[in-house]
Regions:
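Membrane-proximal, solvent-exposed terminal domains/tails of membrane-associated proteins
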Residues: 248, 253-258, 377, 382
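Iron-sulfur-cluster electron-transfer modules
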Residues: 1-60, 67, 233-242, 264-268, ...
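Generic recognition of flexible, low-complexity loop/linker segments
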Residues: 105, 144-154, 164-167, 234, ...
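Short, basic interhelical loop/turn and adjoining N-cap
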Residues: 259-263
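Segments forming glycine/polar-rich beta-alpha architectures that bind adenosine-containing cofactors
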Residues: 161, 246-249
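Membrane-embedded alpha-helical bundles of multi-pass integral membrane proteins
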Residues: 1-219, 225-228, 267, 271, ...
């Protein structure tokens, strides 16, 4: 029912906007209506249904948020800006409430003015049952004034909302009403599924990185940039994603890193980048050039401020995670994400262009992501969190050589042994020992893959990891029982490069992927079981 309630509130925005247009005229003339459709019964029925349904829906959503807004990691609203959500909810309640009351008042006014036919259920199917009795014997002039006042209140609430939202470019809970259409339309898949899918290619000099492009770059004297180190290097879809975040916390609720106490929340990761982007946006810089300078905050003043999320639920995340008491970025960005070095502002946002990793997003948070994709799968506005994490990792690995030492060991093992554990290739067939049938190997038992129905790609885990070996054996047995001929590459198989790509080493991934493509072409593989 929550999805239905949210859908009703969403639909109320474009439909009830026309009642806002009507309200401007109703201040002066209570019987004014939109040309052509204003007194068209189906339109009036739609307005009344949407107004009443969205009123019930928003009240229900407020109750859900209030119940789920617990303190600590258990709440998906931890870190969300509470006052912004309450402001948006209050505005919706006020506007749709005014529409409800206006329909009652209009029905009462028509009844008082002896326009019984216009006040009938044909035009007021829901609110007329309350309005018509109220209009009996009432003064039409008084009811006309009531209509004017309600219309004015509706206009003031709506315009106040537009002004405040316009002044708060980082108010995602409001801006998603405009940007969600863009982020959903521009997602990776056009078949209606979520944005979860293959990682975006790394763009270098306007081209997707490939082995051929790497060869060109080696011959060139230019120094290309890999990945993203500053906010302006993100493409427009990424920036739209940041501003479209609704702060609903569904990504945070299912994040394994967050739920196991790691210093990462996909929601707060997005909000950190959003707030930094808003703080260093070109229009802010233009205002500074005109003499509008942000407030200067000294280290002493900053140290005297309470360390918590400020307006975001009052939770001291730094304290709860055992971090330093006086971290610079604590109000708009989760303190656990940050080891602040850039110039902080009163709100805790880095207000000057700065490297993102270490100054907007903490290194521990960046490497805590498992790239499982639960955040992307759950996001209602199709924000692509994983791609943004990998963008930052690519820069750290390929430009800064800044990554956990365990990854360095894995990279070397992938390069030398073709698997993340550094095990010898000759052990890739150990999973087949003990089977009641022989597993043919391409180049040994069969000349090439064209002699069998399928090439069975075992993979590193399926070949080396004890639990995965059971799955590999089961698949092979099923193929054998079904009478499907298959073969494997044995020690000719190498890692797909997926671990390297998830870790940000796109160059190593492209190298391994190209090797595998070459191998598959050589053996003539047409149909592959993975």
């Amino acid at each position: 029912w929550i999805r239905l309630a949210h859908w009703l509130v969403m639909v109320s925005f474009p439909i009830l906007f026309f009642t806002l247009v009507t309200g401007y005229a109703q201040i002066f003339s209570p019987d004014w209506a939109l040309p052509l459709i204003g007194h068209f019964p189906p339109w009036e029925w739609l307005v009344e249904f949407i107004a009443l349904a969205s009123t019930i829906a928003i009240i229900g959503l407020i109750v859900v948020r209030s119940v789920n807004t617990a303190h600590g990691r258990k709440s998906r609203f931890t870190g969300s800006t509470r006052w912004q959500a309450r402001f948006v909810e209050a505005t919706i309640v006020a506007v749709v409430g005014c529409v409800d009351l206006l329909r009652v008042a209009e029905s009462a006014w028509l009844s008082a003015a002896q326009h019984e036919q216009s006040a009938s259920w044909v035009h007021f199917p829901i609110f007329g049952w309350l309005g018509r009795p109220l209009g009996q014997g009432a003064n039409p002039d008084t009811l006309a004034n009531v209509i004017a006042v309600l219309a004015l209140v509706k206009i003031l609430c709506s315009m106040t909302w537009f002004v405040i939202v316009g002044l708060q470019p980082s108010m995602g809970v409001a801006w998603h009403r405009f940007l969600a259409f863009i982020t959903i339309y521009a997602r990776k898949h056009d078949d209606g599924t979520s944005a979860l899918g293959p990682l975006e290619p790394m763009i270098v000099d306007g081209k997707p990185l490939t082995v051929d492009l790497l060869d060109e770059l080696e011959e060139s004297d230019a120094e290309p940039n890999f990945g993203v180190s500053r906010i302006e290097q993100f493409h427009w879809k990424a920036l739209a994603d940041f501003s479209a975040c609704t702060e609903c916390g569904r990504c945070q609720d299912l994040c394994p890193a967050w739920n196991t106490g790691k210093p990462l929340s996909p929601k707060l990761f997005t909000l950190a980048l959003r707030d930094h982007h808003a703080a260093v946006a070109p229009f802010i810089a233009a205002a500074q050039q005109l003499g509008v300078e942000p407030e200067e905050v000294s280290d002493e003043q900053l140290a005297q401020r309470p360390v918590h999320l400020g307006v975001r639920d009052g939770l001291s995340v730094n304290t709860s995670l055992g971090l330093a008491e006086n971290s610079a970025h604590t109000q708009d960005i989760l303190g656990a994400l940050l080891e602040a070095k850039a110039a902080p502002s009163e709100t805790g946002v880095a207000t000057k262009p700065a490297p993102l990793v270490g100054e907007v997003i903490g290194e521990a948070a960046l490497w805590a992501c498992t790239t499982c994709g639960a955040c992307v799968d759950q996001c209602p506005v199709d924000i692509e969190h994983i791609d943004r994490v990998i963008d930052l990792r690519r820069n750290q690995v390929l430009m800064e050589s800044a990554f956990p030492k365990e990854l360095g060991q894995m990279f070397r093992k992938l390069e030398s042994k073709g698997n993340p554990w550094g095990l010898p290739p000759r052990k890739r067939l150990e999973w087949a020992k003990g089977l009641e049938f022989d597993v043919p190997v391409v180049g040994v038992d069969v000349e090439d893959a064209s002699e069998v129905d399928y090439l069975f790609w075992v993979g590193c885990a399926g070949a080396y990891e004890d639990r995965a070996k059971k799955t590999t054996r089961a698949v092979a047995e099923l193929l054998h029982i079904a009478g499907v001929s298959f073969a494997v590459l044995g020690d000719g198989e190498s890692c797909t490069g997926d671990p390297a790509r998830r870790a940000g080493n796109e160059i190593l991934f492209q190298t391994l992927a190209a090797q595998n493509v070459e191998t598959l072409n050589e053996v003539g593989a047409k149909r592959i079981v993975v």
